């Protein structure tokens, strides 16, 4: 069986460091590992419209922004197909067929859907498209016969729902769809990076993000304003590491060489944590260290992005080429689905028998 990756992002804004440690960095590693036959990376504009139907311009403006972020982090269009979801109409038809395999009550039990309905204040009036987007995601994944879906922890319920749809379809119509597996980040801190305000999730809509394209002074300003341990009022006070976003970010970003370069009095992060917990280490010092670490990580990404910004026609051609490949692959899967469901009427020689 071919090893195939499908992953992607909603174009509702520029991508941030939560995307980077949660998925983007891993995508680049997998892309360069040589272990996968095909990689599809989707700019999920149709999904973004499920809660932005009254503001399509917002989605339109961010198509290229997301593509630029992909190219800046190292996604190689020679190794991965970057495509736009709405340019693959077969996905909509697959979603329609899968809707018959999922109950309303099952969608209501999806923890990710429940949390996002609450976050977006949709409790009293839920758009149908938004409510059913786990089914749309299942269409996205199965259309490309994905075996692996790199994603953050918050996407686990979505993958489970997709697997249920695959199991049900294959049980009813015969073995047709490929069963996908989720691939979570190995670093626990990368599963869900908190916002700079200490909230559970970094989110564009909450305004608590550090963007991959942020300028150095903006990054520093955001880091220096980060939430820490509210009980750590004086330098000499013992501080808490658990639930402290600054240390969560250091878990996700810092490497031993960063200590040698930026904070040589400590050999590693464990030593820094021990000192903070003991007392005698101020928040300003650890924030300055985090700033140095993140500037080192984000500078080459920002520079590559600025280079691609000068080549926008080439970026558009990359999206066109990727979308053409994606459409061809999805069309083949849809043909198999229609055949299994026995609704490929004009391809069926037994129709009149």
Can you name each region flagged by the protein language model?
Residues 11, 149-150, 208:
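A generic structural motif
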Residues 113-115, 119-169, 173, 194-195:
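Internal, conserved structured core segments that host functional sites
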Residues 2-139, 257, 296-298, 306:
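N-terminal Rossmann-like or analogous alpha/beta NTP/dinucleotide-binding catalytic cores
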Residues 157, 163-353:
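Conserved nucleotide- and phosphate/pyrophosphate-binding catalytic cores
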Residues 1-3, 346-347:
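Extreme N-terminus of proteins, especially the signal/transit-peptide cleavage junction
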């Amino acid at each position: 069986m071919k090893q195939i990756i499908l992953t992607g992002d909603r174009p509702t804004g520029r991508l941030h460091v939560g995307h980077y440690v949660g998925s983007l960095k891993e995508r680049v590693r997998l892309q360069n590992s040589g272990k996968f036959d095909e990689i599809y990376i989707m700019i999920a504009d149709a999904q973004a419209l499920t809660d932005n139907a009254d503001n399509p311009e917002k989605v339109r403006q961010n198509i290229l922004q997301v593509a630029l972020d992909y190219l800046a982090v190292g996604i190689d269009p020679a190794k991965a197909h970057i495509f736009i979801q709405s340019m693959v109409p077969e996905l909509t038809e697959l979603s329609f067929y899968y809707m018959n395999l999922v109950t309303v009550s099952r969608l209501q039990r999806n923890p990710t859907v429940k949390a996002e309905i609450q976050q977006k204040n949709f409790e009293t009036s839920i758009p149908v498209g938004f409510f059913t987007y786990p089914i749309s995601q299942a269409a996205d994944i199965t259309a490309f016969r994905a075996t692996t879906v790199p994603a953050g922890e918050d996407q686990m319920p979505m993958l489970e729902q997709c697997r249920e749809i695959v199991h049900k379809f294959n049980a009813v119509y015969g073995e047709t769809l490929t069963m996908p597996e989720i691939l979570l980040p190995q670093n626990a801190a990368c599963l869900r990076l908190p916002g700079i305000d200490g909230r559970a999730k970094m989110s564009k809509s909450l305004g608590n993000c550090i963007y991959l394209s942020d300028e150095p002074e903006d990054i520093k300003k955001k880091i220096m304003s980060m939430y820490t341990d509210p009980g750590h009022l004086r330098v000499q006070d013992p501080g808490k590491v658990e639930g402290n976003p600054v240390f969560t970010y250091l878990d996700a970003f810092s490497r031993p060489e960063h200590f040698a370069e930026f904070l040589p009095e400590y050999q590693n992060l464990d030593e820094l944590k021990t000192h903070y917990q003991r007392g005698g280490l101020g928040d300003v010092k650890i924030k300055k260290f985090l700033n140095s670490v993140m500037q080192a990580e984000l500078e080459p990404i920002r520079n590559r992005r600025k280079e691609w910004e000068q080549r926008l026609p080439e970026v558009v051609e990359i999206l066109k080429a990727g979308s053409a490949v994606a459409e061809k692959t999805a069309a083949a899967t849809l043909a198999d689905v229609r055949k299994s469901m026995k609704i490929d009427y004009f391809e069926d020689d037994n129709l009149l028998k």
